[in-house]
Amino acid sequence: FLRRACDFAARRGADPAWHPRSTAEAFFIAPLLAAAELFGCERYAAAAARAADHYAARHLSMDEPYWGGTLDASGEDKEGAWAAFQGFLALYEHTRDAEWLRRAQHAADVCLSYTVVWDIPLPAGRLADRGLRTRGWTSVSPQNQHLDVYGVLYAPELYRLGTYTNDENLQSLARVMYRSCGQLIDPWGRQGEQIQQTNFAQRGD
């Protein structure tokens, strides 16, 4: 299955007419590199680098923000930045080229612009009653303003970025992001991946 998926992604990325609509296809980069190492297939690594160069050209200037990582937002979002961040960092780890590290830092900075670094006073309700702390959680996009635990998914990469750049602040924040998500692990009840920390709600038309 992995070979078929990577063959598809590599063929798609090699097409001169390939011009993805959003940053979402950057999620192909890291798996392509993993497959390149697993199968010894340089074609996968070349496809990953081509895709990453494409997204760097589109987004490093921020003339076009990272976007398209979520299913339900029509503008820029954290997940789009994470797609590029994980891809750029994977290429740095694959090549040790400092330019990929610089690009990873840029995408990580955008991811972190969505990170809450304080405890928001929550509206009355169950989460406030349980003393939920929002430090280390992330907002989704300017359109979807709730918080989610999505940051835990890139906390390991953020920690590694801190290691590569000798930035203890990044490592410390990554630990906070990773540990914070455990607050909603409970044997009773359930809670979706998002919480509403404001009195604002989107009602639709």
What are these model-predicted stretches?
Residues 1-205:
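Glycan-recognition and catalytic cores of secretory/periplasmic carbohydrate-active enzymes
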